[in-house]
Amino acid sequence: MLKDLFGKKRKFATVPSETLARVPASTDISKEAGTKEKEVPEGLMNKCPHCGTIHYSKDLEKNLRVCKGCQFHYSMSAPERLQALLDDGVLREEFDANLITANPLGFPGYLEKLEQDMANTNLNEAIITGEGFLGGNRIVIGVMDSRFRMASMGSVVGEKITRAIEQAIERRLPFILFSASGGARMQEGVLSLMQMAKTSAALSRLDRERLLFVSVMTNPTYGGVSASFSSLGDYNIAEPGAMIGFAGRRVIEQTIRQELPKDFQTAEFLLKNGQLDMVVHRKDMRNTLSKLVEMHTSREGVETWQASSPLKSH
């Protein structure tokens, strides 16, 4: 009866100990049996940091680097943005491509970091400026590239923006600037900070000449950039979800000892509170900017605006 309470001991195939002794300890038995691990090439796929959707990198590029799952806008390089925006995908003329940053303060390791970014991005600085066509109209455009020193504004970045504005004035063209920056470049000290005043003064001259300036803020736009030229547009536009502000959320909360809203400093929060004119999806950006430029450059566009404007001259 007792033997009925217990099942029979199951038998398993065994490998003689002398056989195992002949197999080196470092041998992967699964590979010896013919099973091979498949390696995924680096950069083949990308995981959305917001919703976790997996994209093939090529599909993500075709979708203008926007997540198909949650519409999260990935950062774009300056060449990618120019290709997506301009009529021919390239600048008709690039300005000041040979301007290179020096190390005026002798900051340790600064030149080495610049050289590394130059090699990684194939750029000389954190912004590309030039003239191109948008919707058939000539424009002067600047695009910041966050791959280069987080697109921080140093003396060369400020100088290139100022010169681009001066070119817009000389050529009587609209000026469009895409911002993406961590702020002023600390390695250049006060030379970096004074670019805020210099670029703002140049935009004041552009305004006196009654020429259009459209500022497009992308993620992230912070510090001295948000406190100067990026907030001075005739139209201030941002991409969805872009983080825009001066100091970071944590610094502000620690200073005022209050909890901030969850959507604080997002493009949508700023639009709701009157600090932006539009939040425009990347797929609609080219069409939106084309319409704004057309409206402000053609006589037909001006007349259409005057007819629809509630502000009538007396």
From Swiss-Prot:
Residues 44-311 form the CoA carboxyltransferase N-terminal domain. A zinc finger (C4-type) spans 48-70. Zn(2+) binds at C48, C51, C67, C70. Its cofactor is Zn(2+). Binds 1 zinc ion per subunit. Its main location: cytoplasm. Pfam families: Carboxyl_trans, Zn_ribbon_ACC. One of its GO terms (molecular function) is carboxyl- or carbamoyltransferase activity. It catalyses: N(6)-carboxybiotinyl-L-lysyl-[protein] + acetyl-CoA = N(6)-biotinyl-L-lysyl-[protein] + malonyl-CoA. Gene3D superfamilies: 2-enoyl-CoA Hydratase, Chain A, domain 1. Pathway: Lipid metabolism; malonyl-CoA biosynthesis; malonyl-CoA from acetyl-CoA: step 1/1. It is an enzyme of class 2 (transferase). GO terms for cellular component: acetyl-CoA carboxylase complex. It comes from the Bacteria. Keywords: ATP-binding, Cytoplasm, Fatty acid biosynthesis, Fatty acid metabolism, Lipid biosynthesis, Lipid metabolism, Metal-binding, Nucleotide-binding, Transferase, Zinc, Zinc-finger. GO terms for biological process: fatty acid biosynthetic process; malonyl-CoA biosynthetic process. Its EC number is 2.1.3.15. Belongs to the AccD/PCCB family. Component of the acetyl coenzyme A carboxylase (ACC) complex. Biotin carboxylase (BC) catalyzes the carboxylation of biotin on its carrier protein (BCCP) and then the CO(2) group is transferred by the transcarboxylase to acetyl-CoA to form malonyl-CoA. Acetyl-CoA carboxylase is a heterohexamer composed of biotin carboxyl carrier protein (AccB), biotin carboxylase (AccC) and two subunits each of ACCase subunit alpha (AccA) and ACCase subunit beta (AccD). NCBIfam families: accD. This is Acetyl-coenzyme A carboxylase carboxyl transferase subunit beta. It comes from Brevibacillus brevis (strain 47 / JCM 6285 / NBRC 100599).
